[in-house]
C-alpha cells in the first residue's frame, strides 16, 4: 500500500491556483480510476485506487498548505505505511511551468507545506514529485502562488499534471528510483 499526498489549500477560491497543483494531480488519478473522495477523520479527503494490484491511498489535506504534516503523519500511522511508500506532490517555483522533477529526498526548499511534513514525519528522506509553476517576474510570491494559471500556461500545466499522474501509476509496479530516472529525463 502506498500513500500519495497532493498538497494544496481547501476551498473553491484556491481550486485552480498554482499552489494547488498537488491537489490537481491526485484529482486526476481519482478521475482516471473513477473513485470518490471521502472525508477522512485525519483532516483530509481520501480516495483509494488500485493500480496493477497495488492499493494507493490518495490524500488532499484540508489543513491548509502550511499544516499539511498534521494530516499526513496520522494517515501514515493509521494505515501503517512506511515513509518509503509515501509520495508528496507539490508546486515548485524553481521549475518552469510544465516541468516535473522526482526526488527521493531533500530539504523543504522554502516550501511551507514540505516544512510541515518534514517536521511531522521527522525525516527529509521521502519521495516527492515537484511540479513546476515558475517564479513571478516581480511582486510577492504569495500572491503569485495563490493566483490561477493564465490561459497561455494551461496546456503546459495540464501536461505536467498528466505526466505526474502517469509517474505515480508507474510507481505502483516499479521502484521509485526507476520511475524517477524515467521521468526526470523527459
Curated annotation (Swiss-Prot):
It comes from the Bacteria. Its EC number is 3.1.1.29. Gene3D superfamilies: Peptidyl-tRNA hydrolase. The record marks 91 as: Stabilizes the basic form of H active site to accept a proton. PROSITE patterns: PEPT_TRNA_HYDROL_1, PEPT_TRNA_HYDROL_2. It is found in: Cytoplasm. Monomer. Hydrolyzes ribosome-free peptidyl-tRNAs (with 1 or more amino acids incorporated), which drop off the ribosome during protein synthesis, or as a result of ribosome stalling. This is Peptidyl-tRNA hydrolase. It comes from Listeria monocytogenes serotype 4a (strain HCC23). The gene is pth.
